[in-house]
Amino acid sequence: VEYDHARICSLIRNLTGEGYAVPAAADVDAALLSGETETALIKQLSLFCEELRLAARDYDPSHINRYLVELAGCFHRFYTVCRIKGEEDAVLKARLKLADETRSVLKNGLALLGVDAPEKM
């Protein structure tokens, strides 16, 4: 989980160095994120609040831990299948935003568990 957070941070640093910036959600064409691994990652991201609710209800932080491991797995599959760098500009921006949202959820989930989210490994 920490490695995937660091990997996303590295990706963002590299693309920022090439003149790209993480776009605002309003500047992304979400319809371009229609591939199987992209939609699986989006679905997994959408479950974060529910997992937080379950963890609070059950007084069981392992809900968050399991969720983060599953999210990291979804991101790994996405990153393996979907190119970000070198894609058409609109696709690059959409995938970069998806990666950044994943980074944010990983960071917040790790913080809830009292674990640092490294930007480099």
Show where each model-derived region lies.
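Non-catalytic interaction-recognition regions
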Residues: V1-M121
